[in-house]
Amino acid sequence: MAPPETGDELVFFVNGKKVVEKDVDPETTLLTYLRRKLGLCGTKLGCGEGGCGACTVMISKYDPFQKKILHHTANACLFPICALHHVAVTTVEGIGNTKSRLHPAQERIAKSHGSQCGFCTPGIVMSMYTLLRNKPKPKMEDIEDAFQGNLCRCTGYRPILEGYRTFAVDSNCCGKAANGTGCCHSKGENSMNGGCCGGKANGPGCCMNEKENVTMMSSSLFDSSEFQPLDPTQEPIFPPELMTQRNKEQKQVCFKGERVMWIQPTTLQELVALKSQYPNAKLVVGNTEVGIEMRLKNMLYPVILAPAWIPEMNAVQQTETGITFGAACTLSSVEEVLRKAVAELPSYKTEIFQAALEQLRWFAGPQIRNVAALGGNIMTASPISDLNPVLMASGSKLTLISMEGKRTVMMDEKFFTGYRKTIVKPEEVLLSVEIPYSKEGEYFSAFKQAYRREDDIAIVTCGMRVLFQHGTSRVQEVKLSYGGMAPTTILALKTCRELAGRDWNEKLLQDACRLLAGEMDLSPSAPGGMVEFRRTLTLSFFFKFYLTVLQKLSKDQNGPNNLCEPVPPNYISATELFHKDPIASTQLFQEVPRGQLVEDTVGRPLVHLSAAKQACGEAVYCDDIPHYENELYLTLVTSTQAHAKILSIDASEAQSVPGFVCFVSAKDVPGSNITGIANDETVFAEDVVTCVGHIIGAVIADTQEHSRRAAKAVKIKYEELKPIVTIQEAIEQQSFIKPIKRIKKGDVNKGFEESDHILEGEMHIGGQEHFYLETHCTLAVPKGEDGEMELFVSTQNLMKTQEFTASALGVPSNRIVVRVKRMGGGFGGKETRNTILTTVVAVAAFKTGRPVRCMLDRDEDMLISGGRHPFLGRYKVGFMKNGKIKSLEVSYYSNGGNSADLSHGVMDRALLHLDNSYNIPNVSIMGFICKTNLSSNTAFRGFGGPQGMMIAECWMSDLARKCGLPPEEVRKINLYHEGDLTHFNQKLEGFTLRRCWDECLSSSNYHARKKLIEEFNKQNRWKKRGMCIIPTKFGISFTVPFLNQAGALVHVYTDGSVLLTHGGTEMGQGLHTKMIQVASRSLGIPTSKIYISETSTNTVPNTSPTAASVSADINGMAVHNACQTILKRLEPIKQSNLKGSWEDWIKTAYENCISLSATGFYRIPDVGYNFETNKGKPFHYFSYGVACSEVEIDCLTGDHKNIRTDIVMDVGTSLNPAIDIGQIEGAFVQGIGLFTMEELRYSPEGNLYTRGPGMYKIPAFGDIPTEFYVSLLRDCPNSKAIYSSKAVGEPPLFLSASVFYAIKDAIYSAREDSGVTEPFRLDSPATPERIRNACVDTFTKMCPSAEPGTFKPWSVRA
């Protein structure tokens, strides 16, 4: 049946309302339609590739085959609008709102402090809501599994899980608050105990609470009894019209767009005929692969066929030989069928099913599994597919159909013919897949190693099957299939042939590994890199398979018990997977003093004031601002070369794209093209580009889609120049950004002479992508007169945004108004680098005279905006036999990228934190900023401090080994004391670190657990545990003195309501909430009377960036100052009417012509430091903390599990314990990413490979410590900040180094088992590759690395 000349009508429902779309473009995603056409902006764009879950919605449809309504989550960023025909969509706006009532899924995440920046919150809410629709009484495991496809960069996940635990039927496991104080999960060796009162030190029930004038400790951040109950009967009904429609006979529909035609046939005959007519058409079910190809790889498929309605392609049939799945069956439905089969069939028949289920468990996230088809997974022919090795090793059969009829092919070594190619003919359709039952005497396993367990693509994956001759341990047949070892999924044919007929014993293992090492060879330059690691994994996986089978053979009652060797007891754990235990956590904080007024919220765990709006999708972010009628969209044109001369720019082809308006470049800048913190950057590149992603121009068009297409059509010719990419290359070529900083204290040479030992070494710390969920966004609105322009920007730095824009436009700063309501995360990434986008958008708005908007796609944002500086530290440390440090000489090298930006400040802080928390009498340090051809690196939470301290802990760890002393003892004897001078000669006052250290040692039960770890390691050869306790000392202040200032503006209106404005921006850290708490106490009124609308340059001028963790300090003092001014004016009125209310006093003041508006100002006194003289005071005060972490590693794969973390943190007298604990946990988990997971990978030519969540992995829900305990140090007021508080944003991040060094501790145990005892180098992050390669053993020795310099690597370390 040929498609009609005109398109059909698309009919679907959104939040219960019918939508009829007569003009639909198949290239439009559901996300775009929701946001642009329906104005439903609660659904967010986080990545555009289905990797973050910010766009999660619920899809509901009536299944006529099962005769029931099905609800499932999906990623709206990939879901094609055309796939919604006769489907219902529910978005976060459709389940509850702040005007009427919140749904329990919204209320609980808000009130449990699970929303910080809030950008990810709607997606998480919808994942929870969909789970509740399907399972109103879920288990905790169901809840954790539901979030596999959701990411959060702010919270550290713990409060989200705690809030949603209240839905779980197994939450109250022992009749008490689950995992709170007194829960059974918190008892025993792993409880947060120690110290006084039988393990209740510092907590509720501690003897300290009985003392006079001592406030109590609390572990309750929210009261679950206040939550409204879930009532499943009150959920919206499924549209009856859709049930009626699906029961009717369906007809083929067709939708035509500008470039793509979408045809949805209803019968197999129609589909086969269409595939014959359009042999190159793509079949799409979930669009999870094709959608990414079209957006990120610039692919175009003019015809798309959607087989989702065809009964035969959705059918599931159990036969005598296996289960046959229609090719359009989703992975979730396959999972459901296999799980049922495993539960019902004899276990010997389900070996393959069990392995497939294990692979499916970690296959993407639920949002992808719910829509992605089994057939699509096969036909995509990805060489790193999780399922294809299972299907190949199992001997699965595929049925193909075309106009010529059906044929069945085996999924064997002949099926994949090349990269992304199969034997399937263009006109053929994959109809079904048969996964066979396993036989008696047949065993099957599947393995996968990735950077992250949840929602990650494989590095290497495999399926392994062995069939034994009946009644023996002799191999009849073996199939070993690998992904990630070639351009296709492959079988180790030679190895399989050699193993047939052999007995399953140690000799077979040795020969198999030798054969695999030869057969699974890789070129040192192989795409994907990690060659040594990948080769070793092939052997490690087989070893695991060998042990697993051996174990099953010996346990099989009917098997040849006497014919196989038993598995050695210390090897058994190698066969066990890391399992997920329910999270256990406690948060301890000091309650407010007895007698504090109820309306005084300072010190109370007040919920983030935007949390409810964020949970309902009502909070407005930059790209949520309604579109102007004449608005245009901008897409950047960036360099594809790291270093090159621009020979020509040709935008002529772009002009032919529909909707094209203009192209802007350097010649269109009306003011100065020079920009940047150090005036060493340009708005647009002119003659030379100095990094991939360097902005050359921009295309402006009527829609985002048109501007994207036009931007891709711009042609640029280059003359390539040699780039500098790595720190090592910069050192060799002496490419440094001057000046080079130094600090000297004492006599280093004399210190070395007096030392018993001298240790030299180096450590590299990789960079880190900010991965704020909201990418950079700007909306520029020209006002039409005198060069005025209004900018809505996602920025931490209004002043520089205003200044740089004014410079580019050639107008004074007073013509530019910058507004920021909130950001979807920042972490330093929006302190300066937003300006490279904002100035471009402003120039475009100036040229066109119309509003212009741009929100970067995730891949663009990661490419151009820079991140945390990679560091190399080279050290020489002298120390005594007892571990006491005498002398330190260090050189730090950072990779600054192609401009200075904030690199000097980052290096300054690194130099000032080289000591971490240790008193070193003699110090000499130099800091070099490498100028390279990468996008300029910039501020990131910690701002150089974590890198400086990480290198300190590297030599501290190694010297403890050298001395043969416990690391915790060596660390403690080197800790500062009260009154000591740092290496930059600042006196330590109010030094609480030793209190934090002692309490953390006690509460973590450190010494008892250390003995248990030693015992565990003796009993396990291939799994090892490690533990480490790490301190931190973090200086608080901008190191640029003039930035330590802030302003505020307070307006009081005649009804008594207060409008508060200050110079800080809200990015999820709760700054606005804290400022309202400060104003509330200062004015003596409830927080409900105070409101913050936004931060803007026309209310508070010359604002310092919201950075350096000082924003609450400086803005809080400025707010307090403004409030005190108003109170002083009100004092006479209050005295004359002592019984009056606030409203009475305000009305009287107004009638007496007393100003009810006041500005406030504050500057930090007496800060400033001179590197030349090593004199001054760079910091106002210090924040302190200690963390103890325990991990377990898999020595065979490099995988690791975070078992437990205890943190004790000094935050002074907390302004808001919930926000402060949230910052501690969020920073810690972000640090886990920095030190164990997140790795930026570049080509030798400087091209960034890791441009999205597909290849760049931040921690997910399953990566946080299973036991996570945080305690705020009690009774430690800080006289130097507002209401005795302390900064909290950055200081906790470095504590996650405890995880890194716990991993290193575990690796030491593995190496000792191999007879290797000397200190070793472990660079950061401790990825599975580095962990596995460091656990030297027989397998690693069989896969040696190629000699550096003899090959060109696929990737380099910047």
UniProtKB/Swiss-Prot annotation:
Its main location: other. FAD binds at residues 283-290, 363, 373-377, 386, 430, 448. [2Fe-2S] cluster 1 binds at residues 47, 52, 55, 77. Residues 8-95 form the 2Fe-2S ferredoxin-type domain. Substrate binds at residues 831, 909, 943, 1039. Residues 255-440 form the FAD-binding PCMH-type domain. It comes from the Eukaryota. Binds 1 Mo-molybdopterin (Mo-MPT) cofactor per subunit. GO terms for cellular component: cytosol; extracellular space; peroxisome. InterPro entries: 2Fe-2S-bd, 2Fe-2S-bd_dom_sf, 2Fe-2S_ferredoxin-like_sf, 2Fe-2S_ferredoxin-type, 2Fe2S_fd_BS, Ald_Oxase/Xan_DH_a/b, Ald_Oxase/Xan_DH_a/b_sf, Ald_Oxase/xanthine_DH-like. Pfam families: Ald_Xan_dh_C, CO_deh_flav_C, FAD_binding_5, Fer2, Fer2_2, MoCoBD_1, MoCoBD_2. GO terms for biological process: urate biosynthetic process; xanthine catabolic process. [2Fe-2S] cluster 2 binds at residues 117, 120, 152, 154. It catalyses: xanthine + NAD(+) + H2O = urate + NADH + H(+); hypoxanthine + NAD(+) + H2O = xanthine + NADH + H(+); xanthine + O2 + H2O = urate + H2O2. One of its GO terms (molecular function) is hypoxanthine dehydrogenase activity. Its cofactor is FAD; Mo-molybdopterin; [2Fe-2S] cluster. Key enzyme in purine degradation. Catalyzes the oxidation of hypoxanthine to xanthine. Catalyzes the oxidation of xanthine to uric acid. Contributes to the generation of reactive oxygen species. Homodimer. Belongs to the xanthine dehydrogenase family. This is Xanthine dehydrogenase/oxidase. It comes from Gallus gallus (Chicken). The lineage of its organism: Eukaryota, Metazoa, Chordata, Craniata, Vertebrata.
